[in-house]
Amino acid sequence: MTAAPLLPDIEIDLAAPAADVRAFFERDRLLAAYALADLDPENVDRSRWWVARQDGDIVAAALLVEVLPFRPCFAMGETAALAELFRSGTSEARLIVATPPNGRLAIEASYRFERIDQMHRMVVRAGSFRPRVSHTVTRLGPDELDDLIDLYGNASRSYFTPARLEREIYFGVYAGRQIVAAAGTHVRSRAAGIAAVGNVLTRLAYRGRGLATSVTSAVTELALEEHGDVVLNVRQDNAPAVSVYTRLGYEIHAPFVEGPAIRRAVWERLTKNLFGRTS
């Protein structure tokens, strides 16, 4: 544990127990859904985390999934503590950062966002879910791996693996022998009782027919059989998608921002810390 030089009352802890980090993220379990899943015992060795403490209590935390090449990182907490967390707690050259709106400027003191997406985290529970499956949907597993890669593109080959399709929930719609729409869970946590739906995609020629609604509904329905909360992410300006998810019973929980960020040069970080400039 090291004392932060600019904020002596905040300490950066690089070795906090996973249980302590989980307890902190549980304060907003819906927003921290992905991080909670990454703290499950079967996933915990794929990630690392660092926290900011004040008077011994965690006031901010960040978690990075190291096994994924795009380096997804989630962070939440008090603004000043987040700023110190990214200044002193990590030196990663590039991250995909997701954080509540208050974290944006704090993180920008050390990282420059190349793009910022304004997002909603939505949630549905069994009591509010309204299934809408109007097409024949097929549960997808390892045997359908090549079909999924054909839909999502060859770049997805490193993401979609037999183990992932065995672990997660995926449904698709076929036209003949070709898959034309699919959706699935990004992560699931039985320990936290939460699942995150995503990767909703329909081939261009088949859009506007409600296929995305059908596959999202099928994934959500099965996820709710095993998890109390099911969440998803959607861009705030994607009104059609928000409408689809709302009809399924999803509600907006909270906004957040997300985007690729690169670490600022030392002189740039010093300039921002001294003068508060943004770019």
Locations of regions flagged by a protein language model:
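Conserved beta-strand-loop-alpha-helix junction that forms the acyl-donor binding cleft
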Residues: 98-103, 231-242, 258-271
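Conserved catalytic-core motifs of GNAT/GCN5-like acyltransferases
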Residues: 114-125, 251-269
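Short amphipathic alpha-helix that is part of the acyltransferase structural core
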Residues: 2-34, 120-121, 125-158, 273-279
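Acyl-donor-binding surface of acyltransferase catalytic domains
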Residues: 2-3, 46-48, 58, 63-133
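Flexible, substrate/cofactor-facing loop regions flanked by secondary structure
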Residues: 128-195
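Conserved donor-binding loop and adjoining core beta-sheet/short helix segment
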Residues: 6-12, 23-88, 183-198
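Conserved acetyl-CoA-binding loop-helix of GNAT-fold acetyltransferases
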Residues: 78-89, 202, 208-224, 242-247
